[in-house]
């Protein structure tokens, strides 16, 4: 991968705020984990995890090789993640202009 890669931050939150504290116990959370595993297998996953100050919310960083792949990243996040497609999570797909990384 090079500096022309497409980076995105995916910000996930429960569609129903009442499940925020128990999101990890909900069986639909497994769909989200499966999505993250597929992204790792594709080599796109940089990092993923819950936000310590926001129960039930999380962030995922994806890096897709090549420029101009935001539409593909959006499709992956909204259609390929069954936890989003089913309405369990909402997701904000944010293009990320990375200026420095290790």
Each model region followed by its residue ranges:
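Conserved, structured core segments of small domains
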Residues: 1-102
């Amino acid at each position: 991968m090079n500096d022309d890669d497409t980076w995105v931050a995916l910000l996930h939150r429960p569609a129903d705020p009442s499940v925020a504290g128990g999101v990890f116990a909900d069986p639909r959370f497994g769909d989200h984990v499966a999505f993250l595993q597929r992204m790792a297998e594709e080599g796109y996953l940089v990092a993923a995890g819950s936000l310590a100050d926001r129960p039930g919310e999380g962030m995922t960083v994806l890096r897709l090789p090549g420029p101009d792949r935001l539409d593909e990243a959006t499709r992956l996040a909204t259609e390929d993640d069954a936890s989003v497609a089913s309405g369990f999570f909402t997701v904000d797909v944010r293009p990320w202009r990375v200026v420095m990384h290790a």
